[in-house]
Amino acid sequence: MVIKIIKTSYLATALVYIFSIAIAEISFDKIDTVKIWNTIQNENIQIRWTYYGGYPICQTTSLLPFSLESIASVIEDVGNYPNIFKRIHKTEILQNDIVHIMLNMPLFLSNRDYVIQYKKQKSQETWEFTFNAVEHLDAPENNKYVRLVNAAGRWQLTPESKKTTLVSYTWNGELLGDFPKFALERAWETQGNEIIHWIADALE
């Protein structure tokens, strides 16, 4: 009887886990092979975008005067994002590797939110933090937000020295909802600059 109860409980837990997550993955494995990019900004912070897998994919890159370890510690602290990335007003940790992120949008635009599952990977040359949108029973869609159902991104950190790191952030620039298409490139430029500045501000 005890064995049956344990097995039943284990099965129920497994089923809840399976049915609470549905992954819609955008892979950035081949993004570095893309040859055609549209340059938005070519300064200390470089920002560009391209179509990849049917989505507008954006990338911001900059060399920051901080160690890889210090930058990685900021990126992986998802619960602290509202204190780092100023457009994020709330995060909810749903599971060890799943988080619900809520964004404030400027002016008359509807706020956005997304639920992502993330993973970290480190090699001798780089540190990566990638994420993709998932569905989760504890974070149903809310009419106060436009759900970014295809949210995806990749942080890539490459050390240039012990105290300098090349930071690259690639993300799906799709904003959905009521966001005007003519303003997308301006929004990507703003986001690309803000993300780098906020990382630097958090470490100064």
Which stretches of residues belong to each language-model region?
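Bacterial N-terminal signal peptides that target proteins for export
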Residues: 2-13
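Hydrophobic ligand-binding cavity/cleft-lining segments
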Residues: 23-96
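Short beta-strand segments that buttress and anchor functional surface loops
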Residues: 48-49, 99-106, 131-133
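Hydrophobic-ligand binding "helix-grip"
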Residues: 25-26, 37-39, 113-161
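A short acidic/glycine-rich loop-to-helix N-cap element
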Residues: 140-147, 173-194
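N-terminal signal peptide c-region/cleavage motif recognized by signal peptidases
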Residues: 18-19
